[in-house]
Every structure is written in structure tokens, then in C-alpha cells.
Amino acid sequence: MTPIELSTRRRVTGLTSDEFARLFVSLQREVDGEAAQWSATDVESWELVGPPVTAEQHLIDTFAAANEFVSTLADRLYHTIMPVTEDSVITAYSDDITFWGSHPDLGGVPHALWNIAVLQAAEWARKETGIICELDVRKPLV
């Protein structure tokens, strides 16, 4: 995977370099039978110098996990807000700490993935009903 491909694929997920790097590190597993030892700083640098060959499959798996999370969550949120009304409100988060405080079971997942799923669910509801959900953005806890 070239640096430009990595950068482009990361941007498509909606994550910043830092958010993607932290997600990648949190999902690390073994590489060639040994525990992977990459740091978030290593992962961020790969957008400039390219990732090591040993990280390539793990990068692909991380992108797939992020996309699957957003797809599954958007579907859950859509079914939660339906039937949508003029008073329907859906919550987005402005930072990870506030998001994790509201959803401790999702600790470690970047708030950006939640927000993408929220927007996708709201768009599906709008297309089906013509009603636009209000978006409530939670202020940071700190």
C-alpha cells in the first residue's frame, strides 16, 4: 500500500490521521506469530513513508472493521429513530471523551465513526419520510 493510498483510504473513513492510528493500534494483533508493536506515531508516519509490508493486511482489516462498524451502527440507529417525527433528535459528539462517557461500551472507538453513522441513519430517515431529524451535538465534558 502506497502512502497516497493509505491516506486516501483513511480520509474515506472520515477519521483524522490520529484517530485512525489509535484505532489501528487498538485493533493490533499478531504479525508473523509475534505481537505487533506499532505505535500510533508509527502509523501516522506511514502516510508519508508508506507502511511496512507486515502491516498491510492489518491496515486492510482496520479499514474493513471501521466500515463494518459504521454500517452496523447506522442500521441500528436508523431502527431506533424510526418512526421519525418532527421532534426526532439524534445525538452526535464533539470529542471522544464525551462520546465514551455516554457510551462506555464503545470506549476506544473514535467518535467520528459514531457521527458518520448518525448522519447516515438520519439521511436514510429523511429519504424515507421527508422529515429532517434535529442533530444534537454534545458539548465536551472537559
Q: Each PLM stretch: what is its role?
A:
Residues 1-13:
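A short, Lys/Arg-rich alpha-helix, primarily the initiator
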Residues 6, 20-21, 43-46:
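Conserved hydrophobic/aromatic packing and binding residues within compact polymer-binding modules
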Residues 12, 23, 127-128:
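Residues at alpha-helix termini
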Residues 25-29, 68, 126:
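A general structural signal for alpha-helical elements within enzymatic catalytic domains
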Residues 25-54:
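Recognition helix of helix-turn-helix/homeodomain-like DNA-binding domains
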Residues 54-70:
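Short Lys/Arg-enriched helix C-cap and helix-to-coil transition segments
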Residues 71-142:
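Helix-turn-helix/homeodomain-like alpha-helical modules used for DNA recognition
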